[in-house]
């Protein structure tokens, strides 16, 4: 056949030329596209490709699993289901064809050698049998010959006696008999020699065949041993039935087994006869003895149903996983022991417990280790810790901008000061001119960037100020020079000290005529804020937010303090921060203001924040501009959370949204458990107090606010208004507008609806009108708290006071058929009015309290009698009036109560 080129061959088999050249190279032939290819090379390439593509696994392992359920009795009379899985593994080995052929040839040679040796042995046995038969025949012939010779001798004796008479006959017969005996002896000798020659030939042939079989077996012994080493040992019960030695060995083994069985039988009988030792025997031993000795006539019933489990001779040490709390029964189940053993161990350790008692993790660890087990402690928040620790963080820490919180008393000019720094009008936008949110802003100055947090100064915003102090690096304490130190100023100092944050004092309103900065220094020194010129650590800067005086000095003081602190943060990696403020926007959903502490917060990150989680859908700065990332010390608004997070929660970027949801749900469940436990505890503690006290009025409130911090502050302030008689109960609170659900809740709980910087939608207004609910809107927290106080005051029980208006002395007593005893009196003090309450005093002791029924002056009924005049007084339902008694006239006055 004509040789073809590689290129034409590639076109013929429809494969790329480069691939065909590579295949030739793999087969050991170096070709190019223009080289020719012979038929032999084609066959070589085809064999190479078939060998490559035909490679199948030489070993195949199959695993079979069978699952079943087993009910195991547990403590408390219950049973638990145990899943049982039985696994079977089987391996199939595919041999190489050449190796398989060689093994087959060796196996064939071995079988032929065995068959030849078997045939030789059978022929040897047959020849031995023939030899024995020939020997027996020869022996029988010799015996017959001896018998014949004896008979002939007897005949000769008889013939000698008749010798005289038969001389002629004897001389003729004797030569004939000797000739016959000679011929028979020669024939027997020839036959014996022929048999001996045949026997020698058979033995020689048997020895030759046995020698040849032994030589072949020695030649194949090495190959058989190698093959037996590679092949799995399938059976050891192989023997040659025709081998004499094998039969003897097998008979000896059978005799040994039979002897051991008889020995066990005798021992079992002796054990059964010893009744005194039955207490020390186990149930399994008695069952075995009965199984061996039953069946009197040698017929033993099969013992397939007898359990073959043996009691462990040593304790099993387990890995016991213990949670934060565990009951004694659960601990016993984990260690696979009885609960009584655990209780005994605890008693030895000095702790008394019942089987259902809950023990802590440390006690359970001591008990388990005392019983010899290995303890693995498991924390319930293990998932939370794993999620928090699985983070990508950079290693290079860089300088970051300081976070500065401006704190101080209300109306001391905090926001105005920040407003001047930002050159905007923030204070005018706040309702009432007071700050009610935490404002987070970052400001670029000539000397660097500074992030400012503006906190409220009103007393209701304590928690918001505390959060501001915890998230900050430096506190700027604003004190008005004309007002001095006020309550919220002292509270701000306490927050700063608790957070261990340095304080820079800004003495504001320095341009006012009545400003007294030295008085401010003196008052602050009483609370541990000492100026540097007095040997302290705090910088004092005189500023004016209106005129702009001292603003640059204040910024320089802040940056100087930040330089001393050496503030650093890792800029790269997954971010974490703190929630400054959060609220619910009707169009955007939950919105959280987050101050980034370290790392970079990017759009699209998965954030875990307290009880909430979510992917960041959008990010905005404090001016409302869309941004995609934020570094350390930058405040941003993020959208995309599952709910409104609580202000002050830590915001952390995590990898997996599924794990973030699990951690958030775990935190919610934990919070719910703690809340229920706290409520249960308060119920138990207040049980007897609630039984003794009277009816308590409750003012139910549904509160809605624009941001989370304001809602929290108002809730705390309202609950502090509660008294022993009127309690404020906030049945619902939240962030966002007032919805139909809020109105329905208020109608069901007979509550008033308070909206702080929010409004009700159309559906909520319809419910409010239909149910005649009390809906009020507020924008200043002062007004809200004052009106709630008024509502609580109206719910207070009225207070009554008795006021003495007159005093009369009894001079004489007259009898009247209509009124009975009538006292003639002189009014000594005040005025006596008709139908008023009176008290009768004798020796300054009240002996009667009743009502003045009749009042007369002379014979005329009058309504009142004034001081220094005489009158007649008839006391209703009382006749024991004596001269000298004093009649005290009083009236009850209702006093209107208010909430302080």
UniProtKB/Swiss-Prot annotation:
Subcellular location per the Swiss-Prot or TrEMBL entry: Cytoplasm
SUPFAM superfamilies: Initiation factor IF2/eIF5b, domain 3, P-loop containing nucleoside triphosphate hydrolases, Putative DNA-binding domain, Translation proteins
GO cellular component, one term: cytosol
Protein name (Swiss-Prot/TrEMBL): Translation initiation factor IF-2
Keywords for the protein's UniProt record, in alphabetical order: Cytoplasm, GTP-binding, Initiation factor, Nucleotide-binding, Protein biosynthesis
Underlying gene: infB
Biased composition (Basic and acidic residues): 85-98, 108-164, 177-237, 278-291
Gene3D superfamilies (alphabetical): P-loop containing nucleotide triphosphate hydrolases, Putative DNA-binding domain, N-terminal subdomain of bacterial translation initiation factor IF2, Translation factors, Translation initiation factor IF- 2, domain 3
Provenance organism: Pectobacterium atrosepticum (strain SCRI 1043 / ATCC BAA-672)
tr-type G domain sequence ranges: 399-568
């Amino acid at each position: 056949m004509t040789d073809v080129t590689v290129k034409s061959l590639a076109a013929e088999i429809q494969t790329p030329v480069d691939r065909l050249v590579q295949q030739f190279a793999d087969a050991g032939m170096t070709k190019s596209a223009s080289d020719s290819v012979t038929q032999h090379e084609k066959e070589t390439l085809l064999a190479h490709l078939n060998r490559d593509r035909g490679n199948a696994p030489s070993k195949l392992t199959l695993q079979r699993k069978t699952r079943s359920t087993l009910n195991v009795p547990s403590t408390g009379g219950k049973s638990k289901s145990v899943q049982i899985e039985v696994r079977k593994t089987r391996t199939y080995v595919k041999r190489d064809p050449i190796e398989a052929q060689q093994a087959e040839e060796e196996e064939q040679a071995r079988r032929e050698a065995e068959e030849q040796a078997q045939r030789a042995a059978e022929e040897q046995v047959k020849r031995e049998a023939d030899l024995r038969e020939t020997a027996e025949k020869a022996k029988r012939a010799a015996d017959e010959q001896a018998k014949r010779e004896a008979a002939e001798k007897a005949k000769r004796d008889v013939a000698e006696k008749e010798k005289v008479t038969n001389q002629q006959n004897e001389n003729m017969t004797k030569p004939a008999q000797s000739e016959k005996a000679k011929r028979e002896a020669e024939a027997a000798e020839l036959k014996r020699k022929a048999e001996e020659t045949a026997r020698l030939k058979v033995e020689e042939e048997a020895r030759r065949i046995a020698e040849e079989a032994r030589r072949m077996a020695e030649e194949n012994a090495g190959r058989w041993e190698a093959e037996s080493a590679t092949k799995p040992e399938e059976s050891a019960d192989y023997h040659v039935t025709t081998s004499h030695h094998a039969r003897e060995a097998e008979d000896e083994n059978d005799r040994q087994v039979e002897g051991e069985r008889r020995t066990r039988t005798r021992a079992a009988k002796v054990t059964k006869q010893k009744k005194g030792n039955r207490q020390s025997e186990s149930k399994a031993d008695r069952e075995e003895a009965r199984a061996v000795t039953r069946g009197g006539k040698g017929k033993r019933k099969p013992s397939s149903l007898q359990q073959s489990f043996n009691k462990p001779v040593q304790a099993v040490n387990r890995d016991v996983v213990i949670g934060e709390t565990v009951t004694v029964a659960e601990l016993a189940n984990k260690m696979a022991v009885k609960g009584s053993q655990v209780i005994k161990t605890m008693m030895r350790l000095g702790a008394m417990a019942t089987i259902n008692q809950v023990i802590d993790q440390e006690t359970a660890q001591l008990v388990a280790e005392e019983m010899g087990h290995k303890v693995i402690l498991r924390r319930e928040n293990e998932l939370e810790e794993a999620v928090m620790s699985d983070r990508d963080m950079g290693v290079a820490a860089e300088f970051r901008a300081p976070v500065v919180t401006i704190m101080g008393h209300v109306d001391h000019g905090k926001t105005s000061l920040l407003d001047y720094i930002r050159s905007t009008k923030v204070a005018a936008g706040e309702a009432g001119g007071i700050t009610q949110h935490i404002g987070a802003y970052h400001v670029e100055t000539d000397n660097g960037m500074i992030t400012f947090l503006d906190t409220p100064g009103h007393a209701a915003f304590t928690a918001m100020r505390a959060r501001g102090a915890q998230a900050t690096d430096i506190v700027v304490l604003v004190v008005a020079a004309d007002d001095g130190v006020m309550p919220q100023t002292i509270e701000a100092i306490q927050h700063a000290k608790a957070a261990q944050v340095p304080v820079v004092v800004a003495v504001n309103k320095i341009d006012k005529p009545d400003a007294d900065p030295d008085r401010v220094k003196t008052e602050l020194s009483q609370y541990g804020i000492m100026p540097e010129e007095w040997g302290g650590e705090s910088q004092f800067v005189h500023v004016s937010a209106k005129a702009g005086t001292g603003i640059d000095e204040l910024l320089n003081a802040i940056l100087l303090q930040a330089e001393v602190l050496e503030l650093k943060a890792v800029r790269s990696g997954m971010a974490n921060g703190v929630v400054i403020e959060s609220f619910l926007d009707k169009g955007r959903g939950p919105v959280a203001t987050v101050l980034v502490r370290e790392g970079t917060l990017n759009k699209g990150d998965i954030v875990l924040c307290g009880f909430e989680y979510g992917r960041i859908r959008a990010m905005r700065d404090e001016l409302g501009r869309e941004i995609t990332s934020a570094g350390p010390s930058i405040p941003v608004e993020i959208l995309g959370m599952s709910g409104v997070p609580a202000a002050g929660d830590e915001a952390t970027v995590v990898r997996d949204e599924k794990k973030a949801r699990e951690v958030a749900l775990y935190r919610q469940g934990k919070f719910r458990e703690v809340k229920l436990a706290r409520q249960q505890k308060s119920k138990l503690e207040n049980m007897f107090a609630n039984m003794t006290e009277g009816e308590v009025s409750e003012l139910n409130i549904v509160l809605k606010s624009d941001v989370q911090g304001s809602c929290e502050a108002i809730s705390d302030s309202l609950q502090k208004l509660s008294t022993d008689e009127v309690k404020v109960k906030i049945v619902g609170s939240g962030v966002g507008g007032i919805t139909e659900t809020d109105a329905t809740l208020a109608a069901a709980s007979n509550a008033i609806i308070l909206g702080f910087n929010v409004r009700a939608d159309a559906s909520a207004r319809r419910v409010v009108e239909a149910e005649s609910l009390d809906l009020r809107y507020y924008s200043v927290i002062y007004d809200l708290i004052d009106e709630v106080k008024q509502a609580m005051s109206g719910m207070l029980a009225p207070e009554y006071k008795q006021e003495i208006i007159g005093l009369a002395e009894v001079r004489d007593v007259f009898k009247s058929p209509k009124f009975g005893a009538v006292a003639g009196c002189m009014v000594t003090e005040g005025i006596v009015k008709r139908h008023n309450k009176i008290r009768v005093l004798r020796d300054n002791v009240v002996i009667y309290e009743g009502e003045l029924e009749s009042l007369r002056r002379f014979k005329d009924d009058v309504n009142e009698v004034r001081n220094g005049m005489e009158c007649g007084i008839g006391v209703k339902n009382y006749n024991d009036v004596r001269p000298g008694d004093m009649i005290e006239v009083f009236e009850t006055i209702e006093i209107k109560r208010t909430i302080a």
